[in-house]
Amino acid sequence: MGSVVRDPALIRALVAVWRLPVVDLRVRRADADAWSGAYFGPARRGRLAQAVLELPAAEEHYLAGRPRQALRTNLRHARDLGVTSGRASTYEAWFEAASVILRARPDGHAVGREMDKPGPRQHVAYYVARDAHEAPLAFASVALFGQFAVLFTMLSHLDRHPRASWARYQLHTFLALDLGRSGARHLLAGSALRETAGNQYFQHLLGYRARNLRFEVAESGAP
Protein backbone atom coordinates (compact mmCIF):
# COMPACT_ATOMS: atom_id res chain seq x y z
CA MET A 1 0.00 0.00 0.00
CA GLY A 2 2.87 2.38 0.80
CA SER A 3 4.29 2.10 -2.72
CA VAL A 4 0.87 2.98 -4.16
CA VAL A 5 0.65 6.10 -1.99
CA ARG A 6 4.06 7.20 -3.24
CA ASP A 7 3.14 6.80 -6.93
CA PRO A 8 0.95 9.73 -8.04
CA ALA A 9 0.53 8.33 -11.57
CA LEU A 10 -0.83 5.05 -10.21
CA ILE A 11 -3.17 6.91 -7.89
CA ARG A 12 -4.53 8.94 -10.83
CA ALA A 13 -5.04 5.75 -12.83
CA LEU A 14 -6.90 4.07 -9.97
CA VAL A 15 -9.10 7.12 -9.50
CA ALA A 16 -9.87 7.21 -13.23
CA VAL A 17 -10.93 3.56 -13.14
CA TRP A 18 -13.05 4.11 -10.05
CA ARG A 19 -14.84 7.03 -11.75
CA LEU A 20 -15.77 5.10 -14.90
CA PRO A 21 -19.51 4.96 -15.67
CA VAL A 22 -21.27 2.01 -14.07
CA VAL A 23 -23.41 -0.45 -16.05
CA ASP A 24 -26.03 -2.28 -14.00
CA LEU A 25 -26.62 -5.85 -15.16
CA ARG A 26 -29.33 -8.21 -13.99
CA VAL A 27 -28.80 -11.96 -14.26
CA ARG A 28 -31.16 -14.79 -13.36
CA ARG A 29 -30.08 -17.08 -10.53
CA ALA A 30 -30.31 -20.10 -12.85
CA ASP A 31 -27.90 -18.50 -15.34
CA ALA A 32 -25.51 -17.34 -12.62
CA ASP A 33 -25.41 -20.85 -11.17
CA ALA A 34 -25.01 -22.49 -14.60
CA TRP A 35 -21.88 -20.43 -15.32
CA SER A 36 -20.54 -20.19 -11.76
CA GLY A 37 -17.41 -22.19 -12.60
CA ALA A 38 -16.58 -20.30 -15.79
CA TYR A 39 -13.92 -17.61 -15.77
CA PHE A 40 -16.41 -15.16 -17.31
CA GLY A 41 -19.36 -16.11 -15.10
CA PRO A 42 -21.16 -13.23 -13.37
CA ALA A 43 -20.16 -14.47 -9.93
CA ARG A 44 -16.43 -14.45 -10.73
CA ARG A 45 -16.06 -11.75 -13.33
CA GLY A 46 -14.04 -8.64 -12.54
CA ARG A 47 -16.19 -5.61 -12.00
CA LEU A 48 -13.78 -2.78 -12.80
CA ALA A 49 -12.73 -1.40 -16.21
CA GLN A 50 -14.46 -3.98 -18.38
CA ALA A 51 -14.82 -3.65 -22.16
CA VAL A 52 -18.53 -3.10 -22.83
CA LEU A 53 -20.36 -2.56 -26.11
CA GLU A 54 -23.85 -1.09 -26.15
CA LEU A 55 -25.50 -3.43 -28.62
CA PRO A 56 -27.14 -1.88 -31.66
CA ALA A 57 -30.50 -2.91 -33.07
CA ALA A 58 -30.07 -1.11 -36.40
CA GLU A 59 -27.05 -1.39 -38.71
CA GLU A 60 -27.38 2.12 -40.11
CA HIS A 61 -27.26 3.61 -36.62
CA TYR A 62 -24.31 1.47 -35.50
CA LEU A 63 -22.17 2.27 -38.55
CA ALA A 64 -23.01 5.97 -38.78
CA GLY A 65 -20.54 8.76 -38.15
CA ARG A 66 -16.83 9.40 -38.33
CA PRO A 67 -15.88 7.09 -35.40
CA ARG A 68 -17.06 4.13 -37.49
CA GLN A 69 -15.27 5.11 -40.69
CA ALA A 70 -12.45 2.58 -40.27
CA LEU A 71 -14.98 -0.13 -39.41
CA ARG A 72 -17.01 0.67 -42.53
CA THR A 73 -13.84 0.41 -44.61
CA ASN A 74 -12.98 -3.00 -43.16
CA LEU A 75 -16.53 -4.21 -43.75
CA ARG A 76 -16.35 -3.06 -47.35
CA HIS A 77 -13.11 -4.99 -47.89
CA ALA A 78 -14.75 -8.12 -46.47
CA ARG A 79 -17.84 -7.69 -48.62
CA ASP A 80 -15.79 -7.11 -51.78
CA LEU A 81 -13.97 -10.41 -51.16
CA GLY A 82 -17.23 -12.30 -50.78
CA VAL A 83 -16.91 -12.85 -47.04
CA THR A 84 -20.16 -13.77 -45.31
CA SER A 85 -21.03 -14.28 -41.65
CA GLY A 86 -23.77 -16.30 -40.00
CA ARG A 87 -24.98 -17.93 -36.83
CA ALA A 88 -24.30 -21.66 -36.64
CA SER A 89 -27.34 -23.83 -36.04
CA THR A 90 -25.54 -26.28 -33.74
CA TYR A 91 -22.43 -26.54 -31.60
CA GLU A 92 -21.22 -29.43 -33.79
CA ALA A 93 -21.45 -27.41 -37.02
CA TRP A 94 -19.66 -24.50 -35.39
CA PHE A 95 -16.90 -26.65 -33.90
CA GLU A 96 -16.26 -28.31 -37.25
CA ALA A 97 -15.66 -24.89 -38.84
CA ALA A 98 -13.67 -23.63 -35.85
CA SER A 99 -11.41 -26.70 -35.98
CA VAL A 100 -10.22 -25.71 -39.46
CA ILE A 101 -9.01 -22.40 -38.04
CA LEU A 102 -7.57 -23.90 -34.87
CA ARG A 103 -5.40 -26.36 -36.82
CA ALA A 104 -3.69 -23.39 -38.49
CA ARG A 105 -2.92 -21.61 -35.20
CA PRO A 106 -0.02 -22.33 -32.81
CA ASP A 107 -2.42 -21.86 -29.89
CA GLY A 108 -5.16 -23.90 -31.55
CA HIS A 109 -4.70 -27.10 -29.58
CA ALA A 110 -4.85 -25.34 -26.22
CA VAL A 111 -7.85 -23.24 -27.23
CA GLY A 112 -9.68 -26.24 -28.64
CA ARG A 113 -9.47 -28.07 -25.33
CA GLU A 114 -11.41 -25.21 -23.71
CA MET A 115 -14.22 -25.28 -26.27
CA ASP A 116 -16.35 -28.04 -24.79
CA LYS A 117 -20.01 -28.41 -25.60
CA PRO A 118 -22.02 -26.28 -23.16
CA GLY A 119 -24.08 -27.78 -20.38
CA PRO A 120 -27.85 -28.12 -20.64
CA ARG A 121 -28.47 -24.89 -18.70
CA GLN A 122 -25.77 -22.87 -20.48
CA HIS A 123 -27.08 -20.79 -23.36
CA VAL A 124 -24.54 -20.03 -26.10
CA ALA A 125 -24.70 -18.52 -29.59
CA TYR A 126 -22.12 -19.58 -32.20
CA TYR A 127 -20.95 -17.60 -35.22
CA VAL A 128 -18.70 -18.25 -38.24
CA ALA A 129 -17.34 -16.06 -41.06
CA ARG A 130 -16.48 -17.75 -44.37
CA ASP A 131 -14.83 -16.74 -47.62
CA ALA A 132 -16.45 -16.89 -51.05
CA HIS A 133 -15.65 -20.61 -51.23
CA GLU A 134 -17.22 -21.35 -47.81
CA ALA A 135 -13.85 -21.86 -46.11
CA PRO A 136 -13.93 -20.70 -42.46
CA LEU A 137 -12.03 -17.48 -41.76
CA ALA A 138 -13.12 -16.57 -38.21
CA PHE A 139 -15.36 -17.88 -35.45
CA ALA A 140 -16.90 -16.61 -32.23
CA SER A 141 -18.99 -17.86 -29.33
CA VAL A 142 -21.13 -15.82 -26.96
CA ALA A 143 -22.67 -16.75 -23.62
CA LEU A 144 -26.23 -15.44 -23.35
CA PHE A 145 -27.64 -13.91 -20.16
CA GLY A 146 -30.85 -12.29 -21.36
CA GLN A 147 -30.26 -8.54 -21.44
CA PHE A 148 -26.49 -8.95 -21.80
CA ALA A 149 -24.04 -11.39 -23.37
CA VAL A 150 -20.38 -12.30 -22.93
CA LEU A 151 -18.00 -12.76 -25.85
CA PHE A 152 -15.69 -15.53 -24.69
CA THR A 153 -14.16 -16.84 -27.92
CA MET A 154 -13.22 -15.00 -31.12
CA LEU A 155 -10.35 -16.08 -33.36
CA SER A 156 -9.38 -15.79 -37.01
CA HIS A 157 -7.33 -17.85 -39.46
CA LEU A 158 -3.68 -16.75 -39.18
CA ASP A 159 -2.70 -17.97 -42.66
CA ARG A 160 -5.36 -16.01 -44.54
CA HIS A 161 -4.68 -12.40 -43.72
CA PRO A 162 -5.72 -9.75 -44.45
CA ARG A 163 -9.04 -11.27 -45.47
CA ALA A 164 -9.35 -13.13 -42.16
CA SER A 165 -8.78 -9.86 -40.30
CA TRP A 166 -11.52 -8.14 -42.29
CA ALA A 167 -13.71 -11.19 -41.71
CA ARG A 168 -13.27 -10.75 -37.97
CA TYR A 169 -14.70 -7.22 -38.16
CA GLN A 170 -17.61 -8.45 -40.25
CA LEU A 171 -18.25 -11.37 -37.92
CA HIS A 172 -18.30 -9.17 -34.83
CA THR A 173 -20.60 -6.65 -36.51
CA PHE A 174 -22.95 -9.47 -37.52
CA LEU A 175 -23.10 -10.98 -34.03
CA ALA A 176 -23.52 -7.57 -32.37
CA LEU A 177 -26.52 -6.82 -34.58
CA ASP A 178 -27.91 -10.32 -34.11
CA LEU A 179 -27.72 -10.00 -30.33
CA GLY A 180 -29.06 -6.45 -30.33
CA ARG A 181 -32.04 -7.39 -32.45
CA SER A 182 -32.73 -10.28 -30.09
CA GLY A 183 -33.12 -7.90 -27.16
CA ALA A 184 -29.67 -7.95 -25.54
CA ARG A 185 -28.40 -4.52 -24.53
CA HIS A 186 -24.73 -5.03 -23.68
CA LEU A 187 -21.87 -7.25 -24.84
CA LEU A 188 -18.99 -7.82 -22.42
CA ALA A 189 -15.50 -8.72 -23.65
CA GLY A 190 -13.30 -8.91 -20.57
CA SER A 191 -10.87 -6.40 -19.13
CA ALA A 192 -10.43 -3.17 -21.05
CA LEU A 193 -6.92 -2.80 -19.64
CA ARG A 194 -5.35 -6.25 -19.93
CA GLU A 195 -5.91 -6.89 -23.63
CA THR A 196 -3.08 -6.62 -26.14
CA ALA A 197 -2.70 -3.34 -28.01
CA GLY A 198 -4.07 -5.03 -31.13
CA ASN A 199 -7.21 -6.24 -29.36
CA GLN A 200 -7.71 -2.86 -27.70
CA TYR A 201 -7.59 -1.21 -31.12
CA PHE A 202 -10.05 -3.80 -32.45
CA GLN A 203 -12.42 -3.07 -29.58
CA HIS A 204 -12.04 0.68 -30.04
CA LEU A 205 -13.06 0.53 -33.71
CA LEU A 206 -16.08 -1.61 -32.81
CA GLY A 207 -17.29 0.85 -30.19
CA TYR A 208 -16.36 -0.82 -26.90
CA ARG A 209 -15.89 1.46 -23.90
CA ALA A 210 -14.36 0.87 -20.47
CA ARG A 211 -17.07 0.55 -17.85
CA ASN A 212 -17.44 -0.70 -14.30
CA LEU A 213 -20.03 -3.43 -13.83
CA ARG A 214 -22.55 -3.98 -11.08
CA PHE A 215 -24.37 -7.33 -11.14
CA GLU A 216 -27.69 -8.11 -9.52
CA VAL A 217 -28.72 -11.75 -9.28
CA ALA A 218 -32.48 -12.16 -9.61
CA GLU A 219 -33.86 -15.05 -7.61
CA SER A 220 -36.39 -17.42 -9.19
CA GLY A 221 -39.82 -15.84 -9.40
CA ALA A 222 -38.50 -12.26 -9.16
CA PRO A 223 -40.01 -9.85 -11.72
Give, region by region, the residue ranges found by the protein language model:
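Short secondary-structure boundary/hinge segments and terminal tails
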Residues: F95-E96, A197, G221
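Structured beta-strand-rich cores of soluble
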Residues: F40-E60
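Acyl-donor binding region in acyl/amide transferases
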Residues: M1-A43, T90, G146-A210
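Positions that flank functional sites
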Residues: A93, R194, A218
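A structural detector for beta-sheet-dominated domains
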Residues: R28, E54-P56, G86
